[in-house]
Amino acid sequence: MSEIEIGRGKRGRRAYSFDEIAVVPSRRTRDPEDVSVAWQIDAYHFDIPVMGAPMDSVMSPATAIALGRLGGLPVLDLEGLWTRYDDPEPFLDEIAQLDPIRATARMQQIYAEPIRPELVTERLRELRAAGVTVAGALSPKHTQSHWRTVLDAGVDLFVIRGTTVSAEHVGSRAEPLNLKRFIYELDVPVIVGGAATYTAALHLMRTGAAGVLVGFGGGAAHTTRRTLGIHAPMASAIADVAAARRDYLDE
């Protein structure tokens, strides 16, 4: 792929968002009755290609159950308000009514409440009792302190999620999570991400992850682009990660 010069000593390449590309028909058509959008990750089968984002603004226990019954994969945010408060609905309603400037400060106050292990267990067991696939998400930072609680609650799929996650995190304040060792020793499949480049995705796949989440600030719900002014356009990110998967399967 050709590169462009950004400045002296700095080169890059053109990346594309979904709005900048179009999908065109190929030379072969197929009967709609023969088409299936079902998919599978590890031993878990899903009828529709939809994975619920682990965000308080998207996924409550009730929403997760509804999505699971429709055939999708619901993922509950185990660091959200549902694992910090017995009833977070009043806080969510309050945040929704505030202007963006006041909402940010208020959210910081509300999310200062610590994660309660008993609520992590309760929320995941709600999903289990409803008969849907149980998936919960933690950031790498909180995975080391809460993974046992999540596992004991009977999670089916463990999601390790951050704005961007790498297989080789470096930090001086605490021992980084060793993804490869953690995934190897865990008894349930692990999905990790986000990743937005070929190399980062390939390294995550080599840890033994069952799935890799794609994206860095380029999605419709991301605030990274507005806040920091940086993002990876999603069409190119998906294409790069798909290429990494093909090469990983050939290894």
Segments from the language model and where they lie:
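Active-site entrance/lid segments in N-terminal catalytic domains of soluble metabolic enzymes
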Residues: 1-249
